[in-house]
Amino acid sequence: MYLTHIPSSSLRLTGPDRLDFLQGQMTAHLKAAPTPGRVPALFLSVKGQIEFFAQIYKRPDDLYLHLAAGQAEALERRFKKYIIFDQVEVQNVSSVLSTLHLWGEMGGEISLEVAQKLNYSPEEAETQITDVGEMTLLISRFNRTGQSGLEVHVLNKHLDALLELLALEEKPYSAVQEARVRAGISDPLEDGFLGDLPQECGLEGAVSYKKGCYIGQEIMARLEARGNTRHRLVRLEGQNLPSHLELEQGGKKVGQTGLSVGNVVLARLRKELEDGATLEVGSSSATVHDLSSTLNPSALRAF
């Protein structure tokens, strides 16, 4: 397996009302998750547009929110606008924690040797809290690259000891991003899809339609009932495709590209441009490939 440091920020929620409060803020059904457990979740505007994407970890004594680097402070400000009488405390723990992603095993299997070093049991719960010497680790089976890997959260003071224990080849974050794009997995921050609807950029799997009210829920329910979004997530294949470019056809805006890895880029594209269509992307030509049959549903699970 390979090891990659994930640029991160994070929040910790404590207090007796933490679960009810967070349940009303996000798209996933956190109350249905096991303890310990993890759900991917979106935080939407009242218009249903994506503001934040996070992995939410449910632990016995707190809730841990893992976000991309630089996102925690803004989400903390949002929370504090809504905390009135709720008994909830929000703590930014970005500076004390590190996150590693262990990935790249053939066939997507978890290395038993690595799992044993971490005291992680692959045949048991997806998310586990383990003790290794003086270290307490939060570990979850997690698909960032099209195959299952392990996401490991550790206190910074134990990071060097963990790296020495694992003794794995390190890969840069860009390698994880390239694998993600090729696997057709959307990342709203890296791909520039913040401000868009989840259903239009491959993130509907992070939306639960079984839970109660939350910010943006009315729009999500309306879209589920009518199914009338105008865009979908696709993969474009060509040569030297640019990142974060507005796409036009016949003088009309038809979508936007996400993060490019050269010959492949994900794009939010109007539905009338069907699978196999050819599209001009900057100075290059690209072919549209529908992702509806290739996206791995286990990459997102909102309960």
What is each model feature region?
Residues 145-233:
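Anionic-ligand-binding alpha/beta catalytic cores of soluble enzymes and soluble regulatory domains
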Residues 179, 201-207, 211-217, 221-303:
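Glycine-rich, small/acidic residue-mixed loop/short-helix segments
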Residues 12-18, 31-32, 102-108, 236-243:
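Short, surface-exposed ligand-recognition loops at beta-strand->loop->(often short) alpha-helix junctions
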Residues 1-53, 57-60:
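Acidic, proline/glycine-enriched N-terminal capping motif
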